[in-house]
Curated annotation (Swiss-Prot):
Residues that, per the record, bind L-isoleucyl-5'-AMP: E568
Oligomeric and partner information: Monomer.
Domains as described in the record: IleRS has two distinct active sites: one for aminoacylation and one for editing. The misactivated valine is translocated from the active site to the editing site, which sterically excludes the correctly activated isoleucine. The single editing site contains two valyl binding pockets, one specific for each substrate (Val-AMP or Val-tRNA(Ile)).
Binding locations of ATP: K612
Catalytic activities: tRNA(Ile) + L-isoleucine + ATP = L-isoleucyl-tRNA(Ile) + AMP + diphosphate
GO annotation, biological process: isoleucyl-tRNA aminoacylation
Family according to the record: Belongs to the class-I aminoacyl-tRNA synthetase family. IleS type 1 subfamily.
Name used for this protein in its record: Isoleucine--tRNA ligase
Pfam families: Anticodon_1, tRNA-synt_1
Record keywords: Aminoacyl-tRNA synthetase, ATP-binding, Cytoplasm, Ligase, Metal-binding, Nucleotide-binding, Protein biosynthesis, Zinc
Gene name linked to the record: ileS
Positions contributing to Zn(2+) binding: C894, C897, C909, C912
A GO molecular-function annotation: isoleucine-tRNA ligase activity
HAMAP family found in the cross-reference section: Ile_tRNA_synth_type1 (MF_02002)
């Protein structure tokens, strides 16, 4: 007789394979068509709120794998909080202004067409370009299963948003922190605009290294009691800045020496200068820095005076100890020049070429031929003009600032720019902005903790923030200047009127409306007396003000300020984290975030940066089409994301294997609880059930603890270990007999099913933030006992496994199971046995702490465990120094359950006879 029909074999329609690339898009479409985000809000109304403030990606081009890592990580964290019962908010955003978009539009137009085009028309084209990529990227993010307020994103070029960026600027101005200065800043001659520190990249560049003699004036020599040749030797890597030299900085605490051949260098650098062949003479006289202070040397290029000044910035780790100082071309030069009244000479135009001032100020001999010449092409002619004053010249490669967009080397160039002053105190505050920002950092939690040690020193050491740009596509610094006095108008009525016009017409109003139209009705100002400031804001100001425009404005249902979390790549320590911190500290004196998480960058399998030229780019769209977004999401969760991440086809295939393990574990659990109508009471669980429930409780608490601290790698490693070892490796294996062969409603079967149902549901709540699609699919196939009133995954709230006391200490049992497995391994290989049910174990029964005989037999998946056996001994193993012997089972194989517990092979065992007979 075939007893298969009498077995309760697992049943489920939940498919073994997910067919994710085909099925996910349909499910995601349903979610977004029914606005699942709004449903999530409604389901958690009144609950504790978790706010994740989304840092805006740039609306230019398709998303790359780094974008996918970032948004998936945010989605996992948001959903983790949601499934823990919290209300959540994430309003996605896009950065839409700035140079990269201008460049793309310029490329399409051509330079001459762009220059002939009115600013308003050019801005219109930039707006259209950005709008197109907002739509493209939104769809790409949605294809990753990311749930956010996609219907109401923040877009920095929206009219109201531009108005609020401008209002943030006005708030900074009202607090006295907005200043206009003529000072050197990073200048991109290729893009013709100022840059902020966050827009600077460092690349290797070959430059000249030159040593130049500046002869002392006759009056200086007389004061020092010197005759004959005597001059200071400077070192520089930028010969093109020498025409703008107006000073030489020396260290106030150092001694200087005059050599026999007439050169003055720092005593601490003298030996190095001899070694390098810069000077040759004996050090014949020592001179204190204070003796040189205020004396004049002569610039050998143009005979203009160069004043010797004291500067703390002069170091002794290189050069001569005498620093060429051109206040128009360097931050330190400018500071020391300001302190000592040095003239700021700046003969370079926005294209990086010498302008007419080289002629007007006699900065170079035969200056006319230098007008219009690019400064980098002027190095060689200048070296020739130095003649004998050029003591040594060589070339070397060093790390040099480059423009983030054009990739061209930058220069320092003194121009009129707008700055947020870091070392001034906002009105009403007793702290400078720097102090307020540094103090605010101490209130923030950082993951990883080392992230704090990156942000804090950056803020402690940063210069004033240059927020003006000489471009067209951005929010204008929309202030009026009085033509006659150059005074800037900060009249509150005027500022708010301009902001209200931006609300209605966008920042384009600054370009399309006349001054008269931009002034409020009945204004006391005469439009004829005023001019518009033409600069626009740095895009880092746009994104740095999003806490104000999104979280505080009331225009979005975006959550709380300060936000619970900001999460971006580690490059944002000098970007968004910092710009947001400075503006929030300037206006409110607090950080805009409670927690910062940083992640690394995505690399190929060899750990190399991805680039189209290398052909190693992994596009999210390709991954989703090949593997499904769930695999990409699991890759993120299984990544040590705080460091750089490797991704490749092989890595994704390994991730897909882990996904299959999780999926098939749930499939087995679903299939085995399909006929369970009610959970058993707590006292009905057997020893094995209590063991797995206790183990699951500990493991899930540990997983939850890891997830709470955003350590998804550790959490998933803990969960995977449990699934592989205790759950699938032991419990799901050892309980098959009771699930398939016991009577349908037997206590032991229902208890195990109940344990499986509880574990499944708790485990579902832990995987749902990552594998949301799969969790939803599991629920669709789950029996009523499992899902109750749940319609979809977004109805789910994590439920921990009930606390269950362990029924036994499993240490000895796990060791015994492993030793038994090792002992019989050869029996299987040599085909002495086909299955462990053919065996029985004999030994000290009391050493094995499971009291129920059947549970103990199931633990080893054998037909008997007893004190002694008369069956043929085939193996043995030792536990705690005691020997257990393994024997062929004495009884016959039951044709139904295959346990060797029957009197003959034709007869059912006692248990099966009862079940079938009933």
């Amino acid at each position: 007789m075939d007893f298969k029909e009498t077995l309760l074999l697992p049943k489920t329609d939940f498919p073994m394979r997910g067919n994710l690339p085909a099925n996910e898009p349909k499910k995601y479409k349903t979610w977004f068509d029914t606005n699942i985000y709004e449903q999530m809000k409604a389901k958690r109304e009144g609950a504790e709120l978790f706010t994740l403030h989304d840092g805006p990606p740039y609306a230019n081009g398709d998303i790359h794998i780094g974008h996918a890592l970032n948004k998936i990580l945010k989605d996992i964290i948001l959903k983790y909080n949601y499934f823990q019962g919290k209300a959540v908010r994430m309003t996605p955003g896009w950065d839409c202004h700035g140079l990269p978009i201008e460049q793309k539009v310029e490329e399409k137009l051509g330079k001459s067409k762009k220059e002939a085009m009115p600013t308003e028309k050019f801005r219109e084209l930039c707006r259209a370009h950005a709008g197109k990529f907002v739509d493209i990227q939104r769809d790409e993010f949605k294809s990753l299963g990311v749930v956010a307020d996609w219907e109401n994103p923040y877009v920095t070029m929206d009219f109201k948003f531009e108005a609020n960026i401008y209002r943030t600027l006005c708030e900074v101005a009202k607090r006295g922190l907005l200043v206009e200065r003529h000072k050197p800043i990073f200048w991109s001659w290729a893009a013709r605009t100022a840059l902020a520190d966050a827009e600077v990249e460092y690349e290797d560049k070959e430059d000249y290294s030159i040593y130049v003699h500046f002869e002392l004036s006759d009056a200086a020599k007389e004061k020092l009691g010197l005759e004959g040749k005597a001059g200071l030797v400077i070192w520089t890597t930028t010969p093109w800045t020498l025409p703008a030299n107006t000073g030489i900085s020396i260290n106030p605490d150092e001694m200087y020496v005059l050599t026999d051949d007439g050169h003055i260098v720092a005593d601490a650098r003298y030996d190095a200068m001899i070694e390098e062949g810069v000077v040759a003479g004996h050090a014949s006289r020592k001179i204190a820095a204070t003796e040189l202070d205020g004396l004049l040397a002569i610039n050998p290029l143009n005979e203009r005076p160069s004043k010797v000044v004291l500067g703390e910035h002069v170091m002794m780790d290189g050069g001569t100890g005498c620093v060429h100082t051109a206040p128009g071309h360097g931050e330190d030069d400018y500071k020391v020049g300001l302190e000592n009244g040095l003239e700021v000479v700046m003969p370079v135009d926005e294209r990086g070429c010498y302008d007419e001032s080289v002629v007007g100020l006699d900065l170079l001999p035969d200056a006319e031929k230098f007008v219009g010449m690019h400064i980098f092409k002027a190095n060689e002619p200048i070296l020739e003009l130095l003649g004998d004053n050029l003591l040594k010249v060589s070339k070397f490669t060093h790390s040099y600032p480059h423009c983030w967009r054009t990739k061209k080397p930058l220069i320092y160039r003194a121009t009129n720019q707008w700055f947020i002053s870091i070392d001034d105190a906002a009105k009403g505050s007793d702290k400078t902005l720097r102090e307020a920002a540094v103090d605010a950092i101490d209130s923030v939690d950082f993951y990883p903790a080392s992230s704090k040690n990156r942000l804090k020193p950056m803020v402690e050491g940063r210069p004033d923030w240059c927020i003006s740009r000489q471009r067209s596509w951005g929010v204008p610094i929309a202030f009026f200047r009085v033509k006659s006095t150059k005074a800037v108008i900060f009249d509150e009525d005027v500022l708010e009127h301009v902001a209200s016009l931006f609300d209605e017409h966008g920042a384009d109003a600054w370009y399309s409306m006349s001054i008269a139209e931009l002034l409020p009705a009945g204004s006391k100002y005469d439009p004829a007396d005023l001019e518009k400031i033409e600069d626009i804001l740095d895009v880092w100001f746009d994104s740095g003000s999003t806490w104000n425009s999104v979280l505080s404005s009331g225009n979005y249902d975006a959550g709380n300020y300060p936000a619970s979390l900001y999460l971006e790549g580690s490059d944002q320590h000098r970007g968004w984290f910092q710009s947001s911190l400075l503006l929030s500290s300037a206006i409110n004196g607090i950080a805009p975030y409670e927690t910062i998480i940083t992640h690394g960058f995505t690399m190929d399998a060899k750990g190399e940066k991805m680039s189209k030229s290398k052909g190693n780019v992994v596009a999210p769209e390709k991954v989703v089409k090949q593997f499904g977004s769930e695999i990409l999401r699991l890759w993120v969760a299984l990544s040590d994301y705080q460091n750089d991440q490797k991704i490749s086809d092989d890595i994704l295939k390994q991730t897909a294997e882990q996904y299959r393990k999780i999926r098939n574990t749930f499939r087995f659990l679903l299939a085995n609880v399909n006929d369970l109508d009610a959970l058993v009471s707590a006292d009905a669980y057997g020893e094995l059930d209590r063991w797995i429930l206790n183990k699951a409780d500990d493991v899930f608490a540990s997983v939850k603890e890891s997830f709470e601290t955003y350590d998804f790698l550790k959490g998933f490693a803990t969960l995977n270990h449990f699934i592989t070892n205790e759950l699938s490796g032991i419990y799901m294996d050892v309980t098959k007999d009771r699930l398939y062969c016991e009577a349908k409603d037997s206590d032991v079967r229902r208890a195990t099913q109940s344990a499986m149902a509880l574990i499944s549901k708790a485990m579902l709540g832990l995987i749902a933030p990552v594998l949301t699609y799969t969790a939803d699919e599991i629920l669709a196939y789950a029996p009523a006992i499992f899902k109750g009133d749940i319609e979809n995954v977004f109805d789910l709230v994590y439920e921990a496994v009930p606390e269950t006391a362990a029924s036994f200490d499993d240490a000895i049992l796990l060791e015994a199971r492993e030793k038994f497995s090792e002992a019989i391994d050869s029996l299987k290989k040599e085909k002495v046995i086909k299955a462990t049910l053919e065996l029985e174990i004999a030994g000290d029964r009391d050493l094995l702490p499971i009291s129920d005989d059947k549970d103990l037999e199931d633990w080893f998946v054998v037909s008997a465990v007893k004190e002694s056996s008369k069956g043929e001994q085939v193996a043995s193993f030792k536990v705690e120094g005691r020997t257990f012997t393994v024997h062929k089972a004495m009884m016959a194989k039951c044709p139904r359950c295959w346990r060797f517990t029957s009197t003959s092979e034709d007869c059912l065992c006692e248990r099966c006879a009862k079940v079938v007979g009933a």
